[in-house]
């Protein structure tokens, strides 16, 4: 993943951090192999809200190896070895959405989802939130499109059209939304 100088080498296969259910690192594995073997690994999901309480969604690039063309939360990926959740979130927000947004960690959960192509996501997912009124400058290799969506309308659309969204987003959204509603009550 990195050369002797510690610089990331994009030609080297991306590795994921394998973890136990307490999020303790137990090793690393190539990303594709981890998804083929359904190994539990560390991941993160970023949700960005604007001042109108709309969520920034991305449509995954059509070339993605799973869940291509589906709508999902603002950004999601995997931490690198030694990288904090916020560092990983900031890195991928810049790579995918072309923006910098301060992130706050909200909660973690474990999920497992098998896809039609035989790959399985088995992740301990760290969910983070950020706030901005800026539109992203999307990287077309990662993201096909974006939109801001009002939370209640999104909740309704997730119920009516779940096949338009990634599996993990349908799993996370209600918990995220409840967390934000509680946070807004105490603010």
Where are these regions (language model features)?
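Acidic, metal-coordinating catalytic segment for phosphate/diphosphate chemistry
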Residues: 4-45, 49-51
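Detector for glycine-centered tight turns/loop "hinges" at secondary-structure junctions
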Residues: 21-24, 53, 69, 118
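Nudix hydrolase/Nudix homology domain
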Residues: 30-32, 69, 110-112, 119-187
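Histidine-centered active-site/metal-ligand motif
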Residues: 35, 41, 78, 122, ...
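A glycine-rich, hydrophobic loop/mini-helix early in the fold
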Residues: 43-75
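A structural signal for short, well-ordered beta-strand segments
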Residues: 46, 75, 105, 126-128
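The catalytic Nudix box helix
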Residues: 56-57, 72-106
């Amino acid at each position: 993943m990195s050369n002797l100088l510690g610089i990331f080498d994009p030609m080297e296969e991306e590795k994921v951090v394998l973890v136990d259910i307490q999020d303790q690192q137990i090793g690393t594995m190539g990303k594709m192999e981890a998804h083929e073997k359904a190994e539990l690994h560390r991941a993160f999901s970023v949700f960005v809200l604007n001042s109108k309480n709309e969520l920034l969604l991305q449509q995954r690039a059509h070339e993605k190896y799973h869940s291509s063309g589906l709508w999902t939360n603002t950004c999601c990926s995997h931490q690198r070895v030694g990288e904090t959740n916020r560092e990983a979130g900031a890195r991928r927000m810049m790579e995918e959405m072309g923006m910098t947004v301060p992130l706050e960690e909200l909660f973690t959960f474990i999920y497992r989802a098998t896809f039609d192509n035989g790959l399985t996501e088995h992740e301990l997912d760290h969910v983070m939130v950020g706030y901005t009124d800026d539109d992203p400058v999307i990287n077309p290799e990662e993201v096909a499109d974006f939109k801001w969506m009002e939370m209640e309308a999104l909740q309704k659309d997730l119920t009516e059209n779940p096949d338009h969204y990634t599996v993990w987003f349908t799993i996370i959204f209600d918990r995220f939304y409840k967390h934000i509603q509680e946070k807004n009550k105490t603010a």
